[in-house]
Amino acid sequence: MKTFVLHIFIFALVAFASASRDSAKKIGSQYDNYETCLTEHGLTDDDVFSIGEVSSGQHKTNHEDTELHKNGCVLQCMLEKDGLMSGADYDEEKMREDYIKETGAQPGDQRIEALNACMHETTDMEDKCDKSLLLVACVLAAEAVLADSNEGA
């Protein structure tokens, strides 16, 4: 079975690297535990937010709180199955290690700084589902800004 390296940061990086092409793609849909986590939380692919919705912040205005929470639960499920979260607690070191491995980011890279800032911003949240969605949204938004600034350079 192929190794499943999934966490919110990989979602974000995949989204950022090809944002225009992948903006309609559902967050996490390319990963092995996606379908399992959808089933565990009683959702379908149609219920999951697109990368574009989350990176732009539209998910907050276009959806009800229950939809936000359920999407967060799917994300948390995938993070937990990959050993990156336990309940509402991050394994920050493992998240960084996996992120660096997947992205090739080097120390001082703004993407790592964004990841660290997003983890710090959400670390005290107690609800594991809301925390997971906010983390993903934070990283996606930061990566979108970084991608835009790099295009203008």
Swiss-Prot record:
Keywords: Behavior, Disulfide bond, Pheromone response, Pheromone-binding, Secreted, Signal, Transport
InterPro entries cross-referenced by the UniProt entry: PBP/GOBP, PBP_GOBP_sf, Pheromone-bd_protein_Gp-9
Biological-process GO terms, alphabetical: response to pheromone; social behavior
Signal sequence, start to end: 1-19
Subcellular location: Secreted
UniProt GO cellular component terms: extracellular space
Residue pairs linked by disulfide bridges in the UniProt entry: 37-77, 73-129, 118-138
SUPFAM superfamilies, per database record: Insect pheromone/odorant-binding proteins
Main location as per UniProt: secreted
The protein, known as: Pheromone-binding protein Gp-9
Source organism of this protein record: Solenopsis saevissima
Lineage: Eukaryota, Metazoa, Ecdysozoa, Arthropoda, Hexapoda
Gene symbol of the encoding locus: Gp-9
